Amino acid sequence: MKKTILIALSILWAVVYLYAVDGLVNVPSIFSVEKTADRIESILNEKGITIFNRIKHSEAAGNIGIELRDTELIIFGNPKLGSPLMKCEQSVAIDLPQKVLIWEDENAKVWISYNDPRFLEKRHNITGCEEVILKIEKALAGIAKAASTE
């Protein structure tokens, strides 16, 4: 029994460690890459969030003869959240505006991935900005959930 618990804890630690190193939140989507990206754009527009660009990486790769599974990136931002975060630690600006990657894995599963705000908090040694980090976490999770499910 102790051995089983130890193995389970070791596996859990490894998963948590890999998640922390990765710095990404990955949310499965029931829709295609294009439809998921369309849904994200629609949600952002409804919320009045600025969309700076939508990059179809797989399309660009195809233009130079490289086959790439569907991969799109949406770059967006809201100065009401980003500016207070930069005021706490200006170096976080290198990771802003926010980005959401919508991609298809080797098993044809579609994912929404974005930078974990807690990872950015650690990366930039952000202190005294808990309320802003929580708002960003909630906003990104809400967008991903709404875009990925019925």
State where each predicted segment sits.
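C-terminal partner/receptor-binding element of secreted or periplasmic proteins
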Residues: R118-E150
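Compact, glycine-rich, soluble single-domain proteins
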Residues: E41, N45, F52, K56-Q98, ...
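Positively charged n-region of N-terminal signal peptides that target proteins for export
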Residues: M1-T4
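Sec-dependent N-terminal signal peptides
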Residues: L6-S10
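Terminal, regulation- and interaction-focused segments at domain boundaries
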Residues: W13-I51, I55
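Stable alpha-helical elements in mature extracytoplasmic
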Residues: T36, I40, H57, V132, ...
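Beta-strand/loop substructures that line and gate deep hydrophobic ligand-binding cavities in soluble
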Residues: K99-I126
